[in-house]
Amino acid sequence: MAKQHFYLKLNPPRASFTFDMTNDEKLVMQHHVSYWKPYVENGIVLVLGPVLDPKGGFGIAVIGVDDEMQLETLIANDPANGLNSYEIYPMKATSKFINSIS
């Protein structure tokens, strides 16, 4: 079965978040990075990281999953979910790691 691909945008609680996180928020974000690292290593996450927009940073990911339930589970278990909010967009993706447009 072909993977379904999604673009995720992680919106912080405030525009200045990237620059003025509290110690507790930094800890949550460290856990967030640790949570996603195995999914980067196993290829579920194709791209992951912060966008350093001076008007207000945010995070992005491009993810290939078997179904939307898998995506929902990944997001629900993210330690940063709740502190931050997700926008989710389906994609028609192709790359050298993907055999065809999905």
Identify the residue ranges that each predicted region occupies.
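Conserved, structured core segments of small domains
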Residues: 1-102
